[in-house]
A protein has these predicted regions:
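Sec-dependent signal peptide recognition
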Residues: 2-8
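Exposed beta-strand/loop interface patches that mediate assembly or binding
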Residues: 19-114
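N-terminal signal peptide c-region/cleavage motif recognized by signal peptidases
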Residues: 13-15
Length: 114
C-alpha cells in the first residue's frame, strides 16, 4: 500500500510542474548577428527566444533548431496552432516568460495542430 501511495505521489509531483502553452504563431524570425530564433508570439508567449540555428544552446542542436524554425514557419503560414511543453513551476504568463529572454523549462515541441 505504501509503495502504491509513493508512486501516486511521484506522478502528482511530476504533473504539478508540467504545463503547455498553445496558440497561433506570428512573426517567426532569426536574429542575424546571433542566429537566435525568436517569435513575435506563440499563443500567449511574446518574443520568446527559443534556440540557435548556428550553434548548440541548452542541449538543442543547430539541426534541431532548424526543424523548430521550419515547424514554426509552417504554423505561421498555415494559420495552425502549435503547442510547447514545459516542466518548470511557471506558467504561460509574461511574468514567467519575459519577452526577448530564453524560454525556461521548455522540453518538447513545437507540435503542429492537425
Amino acid at each position: 500500500m505504501k509503495s502504491k501511495l509513493l508512486i501516486l505521489c511521484v506522478f502528482f509531483s511530476v504533473g504539478a510542474n508540467a504545463y503547455t502553452c498553445s496558440g497561433k504563431v506570428k512573426g517567426v524570425s532569426i536574429e542575424a548577428k546571433t542566429g537566435d530564433v525568436l517569435v513575435e508570439s506563440i499563443g500567449p508567449l511574446s518574443w520568446p527566444r527559443l534556440c540557435k540555428v548556428d550553434s548548440e544552446y541548452d542541449g538543442i542542436s543547430p539541426e534541431a533548431c532548424r526543424i523548430v524554425y521550419s515547424t514554426l514557419l509552417t504554423a505561421q503560414s498555415t494559420g495552425k496552432d502549435v503547442t510547447l511543453w514545459f516542466n518548470d513551476s511557471k506558467d504561460c504568463s509574461a511574468a514567467s516568460h519575459p519577452s526577448w529572454q530564453w524560454l525556461t523549462g521548455w522540453y518538447f515541441g513545437p507540435k503542429l495542430s492537425v
